[in-house]
Each structure stands twice: as structure tokens, then as C-alpha cells.
Amino acid sequence: MIKHIVMWKLKEEAEGADRATNAREMKRRLDECAAIVPGIITFEVTLAQPDLEATYDIVLYSEFADRAALEAYVAHPVHQAVVPFIGAIREGRQCMDYEV
């Protein structure tokens, strides 16, 4: 199994919207990727919660059956359609993939 964890810090304003609006839109778009390929075991997109400590605005925690499933997800057109929007609104990104 491969775990794929990504955290994004968003710009204060981008694409004509504020950080909170863009975070909600990004979550909506990423949620559409939750079942686009076989082998996605877990797919959680979460926004930072005001009452809990967070240095990033949005996190994706996902588990894939194997490397092939992760690669299929990354290459899938639905995922690729989200990439330009995320690139336009993000200030920073951290990612870690690891096998368990």
C-alpha cells in the first residue's frame, strides 16, 4: 500500500477569491477525484479547522493499493483538470508518498 499525503498553504487572494473560498472550491474539486481509479483505498480532503492548530490550509490524506494505482490517479484527466487551479491558488505545497 502507498500512502500519499499532500498539504497546501493557499494565497490570501487568488483567482478573484479569498483564501477561504478557494479552499472550499479546491476541496470540492479534489473530492471529485475520490473514486476515479481502482485501487483508491482512502481519500480524505480536509480544511484547516479554526479551533485546531494548523500551519497549512488544506490536506489530502490518501491510501492506494499500490504504486500503479497512485500513478493512475496522478495521470487521470479528472485529477489533471484540478492541477492548474491548485497551482494558481497555492502559496506552498508539501508532499510525502511512502509504502507500508
How would you name each of these model-derived features?
Residues 1-56, 65-71, 99-100:
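Short S/T/G/P-rich N-terminal loop/turn motif that feeds into the first structured element of a domain
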Residues 64-89, 93:
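C-terminal structural segments of small proteins and small subunits
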Residues 92-100:
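A generic hydrophobic-segment detector
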